[in-house]
Swiss-Prot record:
Annotated tissue distribution: Mostly expressed in siliques and flowers, and, to a lower extent, in leaves, roots and seedlings, with highest levels in young tissues, meristematic cells, and the vasculature.
This protein's UniProt keywords: Cytoplasm, Cytoskeleton, Microtubule, Nucleus
Assembly, per entry: Part of the gamma-tubulin complex. Interacts with GIP1 and GCP3.
Predominant subcellular localization, coarse grouping: cytoplasm
InterPro entries cross-referenced by the UniProt entry: MZT1
Biological role stated in the UniProt entry: Required for gamma-tubulin complex recruitment to the microtubule organizing centers (MTOCs). During mitosis, modulates gamma-tubulin complex localization, spindle stability and chromosomal segregation. Necessary for gametophyte development and embryogenesis.
Name of protein: Mitotic-spindle organizing protein 1A
Amino acid sequence: MNQEAAETARESLELVFRMSNILETGLDRHTLSVLIALCDIGLNPEALATLVKELRRDSATTTTTVD
């Protein structure tokens, strides 16, 4: 990746991260980067969103059960 493309990617990720914070998604930069990469290779964004929600629900259930 050339320097200009790398800078554009960093700026795009920063913008997505800011939007994520405004929407209070709780997703960090790394997670957002992985989700963007998965979308770039053709995975359905709605399916990914559903998966993230399910994983959070499962995590909350596990945390509640352990406490």
